[in-house]
């Protein structure tokens, strides 16, 4: 047999090393030893999808027409449901035919949108720390990522004055990625902040891509805004959303993009050439979810708030600095100065059998922080709290 050299493309070489490979290796070693691990590392809801959504899926799956190729843009029924939900939840009016696009999960849309608007060598502003897909999608499109720091002193909001200095000598900046409520920092943003974003984007002629996947996971009666609520936002931007976190449907892969119709159309052109749309039965079930989101979402928030109020004091008791978040199901905990994130996480796995995520996995500015999730039952989090209270590291 001829030996072939299967050399991957240069774009793959540009992707950062997979930090979590070492953590996964340690996890597997512990499991092979017979040790049980408590995982607070992955933001994947442990709660079940609501029954009324599953019932709609079952009915939809029995319709033979739903097993044919779906529309590239998505079912109009689902897009109308998205528009109604945005009107009801945020007071934002959308045209379901031109301002709503169905996605195979919001991650797919985020991963593809640079292909629609970024030419090789052009720049994209990505938050640091931030969801790694923003950075990876830019590189895979041949773009140049410009990380901008999210610092605790600024409540993990960007400093637009500093960003302006960063981009003075850069190639054309095409996209600004934002994400509030934020993963991994759990920070929230106000409508006043989004007004500032609109002003900055219009000044520099930049497309704003806001990731709003955690808008419905909020606490203490503090609903989170949509970027599109800001005056003029739809002129320069779009918003990614998903049913994954809101309805415990991460495996179903249904999301949506809303906003400026030219931005929507650009991503739709990419999708037309790359995928064949989301399964219609899943879109029907997602329609049911959006049409009957309450009281399900209220109860979901109650559960996560109970979990938050168990875990945060336990983290603080170990010597970690950790604010109680207004939204998301993440705790973003700061280690003492000079203590590496990876070292802490590996030690936590080996000695306490608890899995968390090192902050530097989300970017350079994440070093010195650790992310924990609330995606475990209250009884498990109470067990974690007891373990942590007996183990004061600092």
Show which residues each predicted segment covers.
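Helix C-cap/helix->beta junction micro-motif
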Residues: 30-33, 141, 203-204, 318, ...
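Conserved core segment of the aminotransferase class I/II
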Residues: 230, 234-302, 309, 313-314, ...
């Amino acid at each position: 047999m001829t030996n072939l050299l299967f050399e991957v493309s240069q774009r793959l070489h540009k992707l950062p090393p997979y930090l979590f490979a070492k953590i996964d290796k340690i996890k597997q070693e512990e499991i092979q030893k017979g040790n049980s691990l408590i995982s607070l590392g992955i933001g994947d809801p442990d709660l079940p999808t609501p029954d009324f959504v599953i019932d709609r899926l079952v009915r939809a799956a029995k319709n033979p027409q739903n097993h044919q190729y779906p529309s590239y843009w998505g079912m109009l029924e689902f897009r109308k449901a998205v528009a109604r939900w945005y009107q009801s939840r945020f007071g934002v009016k959308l045209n379901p035919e031109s301002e709503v696009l169905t996605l195979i999960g919001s991650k797919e849309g985020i991963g593809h949108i640079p292909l629609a608007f970024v030419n090789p060598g052009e720049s994209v502003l990505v938050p640091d720390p931030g969801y790694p897909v923003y950075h990876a999608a830019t590189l895979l499109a041949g773009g140049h990522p410009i990380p901008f720091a999210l610092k605790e002193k600024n409540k993990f909001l960007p400093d637009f004055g500093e960003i302006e200095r960063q981009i003075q000598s850069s190639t054309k900046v095409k996209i600004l990625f934002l994400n509030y409520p934020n993963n991994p920092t759990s920070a929230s943003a106000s409508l006043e902040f989004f007004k500032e974003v609109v002003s900055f984007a219009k000044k520099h002629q930049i497309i704003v891509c806001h990731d709003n996947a955690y808008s419905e996971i909020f606490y203490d009666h503090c609903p989170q805004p949509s970027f599109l609520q800001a005056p003029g936002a739809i002129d320069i931007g779009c918003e990614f959303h998903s049913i994954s976190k809101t309805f415990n449907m991460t495996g179903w892969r249904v999301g949506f993009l809303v906003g400026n119709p030219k931005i929507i159309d650009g991503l739709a052109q990419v999708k037309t050439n790359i995928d064949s749309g989301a399964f219609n039965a899943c879109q029907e079930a997602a329609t049911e979810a959006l049409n009957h989101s309450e009281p399900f979402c209220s109860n979901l928030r109650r559960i996560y708030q109970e979990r938050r109020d168990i875990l945060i004091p336990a983290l603080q008791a170990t010597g970690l600095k950790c604010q109680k978040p207004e939204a998301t199901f993440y705790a973003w905990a700061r280690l003492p100065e000079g203590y590496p994130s990876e070292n802490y996480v590996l030690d936590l796995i080996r000695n306490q059998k608890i899995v968390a995520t090192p902050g530097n996995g989300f970017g350079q500015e994440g070093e010195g922080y650790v992310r924990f999730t609330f995606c475990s039952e209250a009884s498990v989090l109470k067990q974690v709290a007891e373990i942590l209270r007996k183990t004061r590291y600092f």
